Regions:
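Short beta-strand segments within Ig-like beta-sandwich modules, predominantly Fibronectin type-III
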Residues: 67-74
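Short acidic/polar inter-strand loop motif in beta-rich domains
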Residues: 69, 96-103
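Short, flexible loop/turn segments at beta-strand junctions in immunoglobulin-like
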Residues: 80-85
């Protein structure tokens, strides 16, 4: 019985700490706006600002779930290679020094024409 209570307590502690861990920090993508149209022949400029929180170190830039860049500046502009015509998702995610996502991210959906 004590073993079961101990496992439950440890699980609750880990779950609570991961929720708190994911909640610290913030990423904002100011451009492109969510729902924007982008040119399929041009790279997409992504303007952003990030507060990585206490455990974050850098950002990973994703297009449709594929990592396209690792960014160490907390504010600036990055580029996603030209996107094929259609709907796409661009995300910036805060990562630790060991490249583990902290759970802090921001995403926008765009349509390439």
């Amino acid at each position: 019985m004590k073993n079961k209570i101990m496992k439950t307590a440890i699980f609750a502690l880990l779950l609570g700490s991961s929720i708190a861990f994911a909640a610290s920090g913030k990423v904002t993508i100011s451009s492109p706006a969510d729902g924007a149209m982008v040119d399929s022949k041009e790279p997409v400029k992504v303007s952003y600002e990030a507060d990585p929180g206490p455990d974050g170190d850098h950002l990973h830039l994703y297009a449709d779930g594929k990592k396209v860049d690792v960014i160490h500046q907390l504010k600036g502009t990055a580029e996603v290679p030209p996107l094929a015509p259609g709907k796409h998702q661009i995300c910036l995610a805060v990562n630790t020094k060991g490249h583990v996502p902290t759970g802090v991210e921001s995403c926008v959906n765009v349509t390439s024409k």
